[in-house]
């Protein structure tokens, strides 16, 4: 009987001890990530990072050139006797422009000098030759200073009329006409002018080896609209390039053409080539016979009207 009582007493004591241990075990489990979870507030460094992110301005997109929904909304200023423009979106290959972009023509003037350079370089490469340093200096002057005498020299050396005929056939121009033995009087539509620009950009004109050199040289045209010194030193850095947002200027190559005709006024063409687009503006207008300020402002205006800032 005494043994049974002792066993019962021991059993009761053990049960009591186990009941006392349960709350302690639960506390340890909670501390190890059990059902009871306590989240501590973020530390000072994390809170600072979150505040910095929240204070950042919303991202913005850079301005760009784009075709307008209504091409007819791009209008010339009063006084122009001819006005046409065309815009090629390189992402789609679509050309849009003025109603006369495929029918109205202007004399190409110095705009065609980039082709004269490209044609010479491509043909030289095809014959396994390399231009001399003197030739490259000539071609550079022809583009950045719009040197007429050098243009005439290379035009004649490469075949005269054949130079422009190759321009038409290689660049797929459909409404451009050769003026016999006179490169500056080549008649070209705005639509063909952007095709010509694309031909320069995609390597067809100068070939793979010399296209980067040509486009880079066209980014360094010198002289403002008032810098018309002589036929060998003419300022051609004006027009479309002056109407572009600053972010687009470094990647844009240009070649303008301009001549004043007694009785007919200025014949002016502006060509700009960017990796995303090609734009040309053609205009005839009366004005100062020395400085083509009025037509230059027309080209500038078209570029500004085509500039948009995308929305996020």
Give the ranges of each region predicted by the language model.
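Penicillin-recognizing serine hydrolase domain
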Residues: 4-5, 27-90, 156-312
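Secretory targeting and sorting signals
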Residues: 1-28
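Short alpha-helical patches at coil-to-helix transitions and adjacent helical residues
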Residues: 111-114, 144, 148, 187-194
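Active-site SXXK
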Residues: 93, 104-129, 142, 279
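Amphipathic alpha-helical segments within well-ordered protein domains
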Residues: 121, 151, 194-198
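A short glycine/serine-rich beta->alpha loop
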Residues: 99-106, 179-183
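Glycine/charged-rich beta-loop-alpha catalytic/anionic-binding loops adjacent to active sites
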Residues: 93-103, 174-175
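Conserved catalytic neighborhood of penicillin-recognizing serine enzymes
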Residues: 124-177, 189
